[in-house]
Amino acid sequence: MPITDFIINDEKTPLVLHGGPEQWKTVGPYGCFRVGICLLLVELCERFTFFEVVCNMIPFCTGRLGSYNHQAAMLNLGFIGTSVLTPVFMGWLADEYFGRNKLMYIALSLHFLGTALLSMLAFPAENFYRGAYPVFNNTSVEEQAGLFHVALLTLCLGTGGIRAVVCPPDMCGSQERESKKPMPFCNWASWSANLNAAVVFLGISSIQPLGSGALGILLPSLSVFTALVTLYLKHCDLIYRPENRCSLLTIARAFVRALKTRCLPYCHFGRDGSSWLDHAMEKQGGHHSELQEEDTRNISALLPLFSFQILYRTCLLQIPSGYYLQTMNSNRNWGGFSLPIALMNAISLLPLLILPPFMDYFSNCLLPSKRDGPFLSACMIAGNICAASSVAMAGFLEIYRKLAREQSPSGKLFSVSSMACVCLVPQYVLLGVSEVLVNPAVSMVTHRVIPGASMAFLTLSHGSACFAGAMLIKLLYLISEGNWFPNTLDKGNLENFFFVLASLMLLNILGLWRASWRYCNLNHFNAQRIRGNRCEETLLLTEKSLKFYGSTQGASSSIDLWETAL
């Protein structure tokens, strides 16, 4: 969490801390600075542990566990998706069952247990337990794989608990929801998170050449340091408690009830002209507040956008799967120095650090009147084009990589290509540029429609994209009988996988272009938002949005099937 999330004035500033909304504490500028530093350290250590596992997942699974490339890539995407979604689940457990204090201790214990088990498995023990202490030397590969999966699940639960209790997503967006200013195109909280990730990847790149022993000691040490800083925050009663509004699970539960009640009898309209969602929530009256029901109705209107987002993020997640395999099988020697794989991730973050300030200036100063209109749709379409270009470029470079294979004097071909991995930099940069364009535009659209649950629904789209990417890899592997995602890249056609993904992205772009007019007209949500009672405010905004999403209007109300097929 950046320090700028806390407003520091000359006077003492009230902060909602661990005690809840009813208990306020007065924290001065020094207290705000102390909280910011502690949260920054917690997030830095937690991110370092997470990305360290992601960067070494595929080499470990293919080298030590004997997994195929597609299995390692699917496991990596599954780990990322689970880590993205567990904060929602752990936050729900904290609010409904365990309480935030008890869950914090459980999460810290699980995080340490996961890192310790990963260190003992991944960095074996031949260097430390040779001879008298053969801890994992005598275990079979199947048992090691089972323990590895248990360690990953334990680490995911611990990471989710830390993010939910210590660094909740609501902390970044609480001040933006209360601010009367329109949401800026450049979210400085996201920019600071990207800077944090870049620092983490550079740190991993500098540590990887030291060998597995250093990494085996570092992971549990970071977990212990995270626990100490978190306990210090708990001791000083400085842990932020977000306001209890519409959570993702509450909205999903209401939407599922609505689907069960009226989805089959009423596809789009009821007998009296009102929407099937209105009938469903009327029948389920008393279960949810009016505010939650209005958010559910708005979420149903945004479903086409999030279907496009899932495929886009599936393309974006090629960095920890297909792109990693390309980098591993390319020549990483540069000037006598072996470039770590994590360095390519840091390169993909450069556009996310350089371009957002210029984009914010361009949208605010040069096009202030059109910033909330077609500009957002143009950014989303341009970002998807950049992502499709990146995947297509990866396919062509894979063809060139296989042609540039070296051979020994005896004529034996090496598995690693002579193509320098620096040639892969443009495809990483294009994915970074696409994220600069797409993520702020989608965030602004969802913030105007569902300001209370936009962060949670974006999290759901990101996590769903991880599992969708894993399913796509498995599906194409089965269809091609292993040829399009081969275990040995030189004996298969990985470029076909990239070309198929690029073709799907082109269909995604066409569908987004067809449906973009629905989201060009959402700019009035932020400008005409009425202060006061949240339920009355939501009813007014929904009344204005009905003419675009067609609960009661017959013209241009139905969503084309081919727009949502993806």
Curated annotation (Swiss-Prot):
Disulfide bonds, paired cysteine numbers? none
> Keywords of this protein's UniProt record, alphabetized?
Membrane, Peptide transport, Protein transport, Symport, Transmembrane, Transmembrane helix, Transport
**What's a Pfam family in this record?**
PTR2
Q: Main localization of the protein?
A: membrane
- Give GO BP annotations, semicolon-separated: peptide transport; protein transport
Describe the task this protein carries out.
Proton oligopeptide cotransporter.
- Stated name of the protein: Solute carrier family 15 member 5
- Organism, by scientific name, is Mus musculus
